[in-house]
Design a protein with these regions (language model features):
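Binding-site signature for planar aromatic cofactors or substrates
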Residues: 1-213
Length: 213
C-alpha cells in the first residue's frame, strides 16, 4: 500500500482509545477461558464457522462448515475441528504448524449473535479423535485441535446492519458471474470462451457434489 500524503495513520493504542473511546462497562467481563453450557450449546447448533490463522507472510480466514455440531467439544478447554476435503492448498494448516494462534467465529443461521473462540491450534491424525469427527461414514485424515485461551459471545450489530439473514435483501445469484468465470478472468486478465467457462463451471460443480467428504 502506498500511503497518500496527509493521511493520518494511528500507531498506538492511546490514539485509538482517544477516538474510539474506552470499552463499554462490563464488556471485558464476558471473556471467559473455558466452555460452559451456553457456549457448548451454541457450538452444538452451529453448522458454520470462520477460521483465522496467520503466518510470516500474512493472515488467512477460511470457512468451515458441516452439519450442526461438526466441531466437537472434547472437554472444557479443547475443540476438535475436522479437516474435510478441499483444494489441498492447506494455507490454514500450514499456518497453524508455524503459528499456533488461531481464532474461530461460530455462526447459527437466523441468529445475529456469534461466538468467538481464540486459542492455540495443533494438527493431529490421532485415530480416536478422527473417529469422533466422522460424517457420512467418512473419517477425516486430519483434525485441528484447539486449546482454548478465551471465548465470548459477540453482539449482533454487524448482522443487524448487514441484514445477512434477511432473504428480502439477498441478491439474485446471477447478479455476479459464475465462480469459474471470475477465476479464469483473474488468471488470464480477459473473459474466457463460453466453452472453457462451461467446462470449468461443470468441473467445480462436480467437485462440490462428489468430494465433500
Amino acid at each position: 500500500m502506498t500511503k497518500p500524503d496527509g493521511i493520518n495513520i494511528l500507531t498506538d493504542t492511546a490514539s485509538l482509545i482517544e477516538i474510539n473511546g474506552e470499552p463499554l462497562a462490563g464488556t471485558t467481563l464476558k471473556k471467559i477461558t473455558q466452555l460452559e453450557r451456553h457456549s457448548r450449546n451454541f457450538i452444538a447448533r452451529s453448522p458454520f464457522c470462520m477460521l483465522a490463522t496467520s503466518s510470516n507472510e500474512g493472515c488467512d480466514a477460511s470457512p468451515r462448515g458441516d452439519a450442526p455440531g461438526f466441531v466437537y467439544c472434547l472437554d472444557d478447554t479443547t475443540l476438535l475441528i475436522p479437516e474435510r476435503p478441499g483444494n489441498r492448498i492447506a494455507d490454514s494448516m500450514s499456518n497453524i504448524i508455524n503459528h499456533s494462534e488461531i481464532g474461530l467465529l461460530f455462526l447459527i443461521p437466523g441468529r445475529d449473535d456469534t461466538l468467538r473462540v481464540n486459542g492455540h491450534g495443533y494438527l493431529t491424525d490421532h485415530p480416536p479423535y478422527l473417529k469422533l469427527l466422522a460424517a457420512r461414514a467418512k473419517t477425516p485424515k486430519l483434525a485441528i485441535m484447539l486449546d482454548i485461551t478465551e471465548l465470548y459471545f459477540h453482539c449482533p450489530k454487524a448482522f443487524i446492519r448487514s441484514g445477512l439473514w434477511d432473504t428480502s435483501r439477498h441478491m439474485p445469484a446471477d447478479e455476479l458471474p459464475t465462480l469459474g468465470r471470475m477465476i479464469l478472468e483473474q488468471i488470464n486478465g480477459e473473459p474466457p470462451s463460453k466453452e472453457l467457462q462451461d467446462n470449468i463451471d461443470k468441473a467445480l460443480d462436480e467437485d462440490s457434489r462428489e468430494n465433500l467428504y
